[in-house]
């Protein structure tokens, strides 16, 4: 667990803009998080509605992604729980 937490920390510190492998489990957690975030933002915008497409990563090739922004800290616990 400590190793995985350290890897997530390193990914956030040095991974932004670099290509990395994203496991299907972690990808699903991130997708769910950003979808909920998108829905919350859309529901609060009554007049000006913008399309939110940024999931925090961009697929470069199958299974490999470019991290566009750090993984949210509240997701670290969720990710660690899936690896128990």
Feature locations, PLM:
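Positively charged, polyanion-binding regions of nucleic-acid-associated proteins
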Residues: 1-17
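Charge-rich, solvent-exposed alpha-helical interaction surfaces
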Residues: 6, 25-29, 48, 78
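Short acidic, hydrophobic short linear motifs in intrinsically disordered regions
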Residues: 15-36
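Alpha-helix N-cap and coil->helix boundary residues
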Residues: 20-21, 40, 44, 60
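Short amphipathic alpha-helical interaction segments
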Residues: 37-54
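A short, conserved structural fragment
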Residues: 53-63
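Minor-groove-contacting beta-hairpin "wing" of winged helix-turn-helix DNA-binding domains
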Residues: 63-70
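Short, amphipathic alpha-helical interaction segments positioned at domain boundaries
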Residues: 71-84
């Amino acid at each position: 667990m400590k190793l995985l937490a350290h890897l997530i920390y390193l990914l956030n510190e040095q991974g932004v803009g670099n290509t990395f492998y994203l496991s299907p489990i972690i990808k699903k957690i991130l997708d769910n998080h950003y979808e909920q975030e998108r829905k919350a933002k859309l529901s609060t915008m009554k007049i000006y509605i913008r399309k939110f497409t940024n999931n925090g990563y961009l697929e470069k090739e199958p299974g490999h992604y470019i991290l566009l922004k750090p993984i949210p800290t509240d997701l670290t616990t969720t990710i660690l729980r899936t690896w128990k």
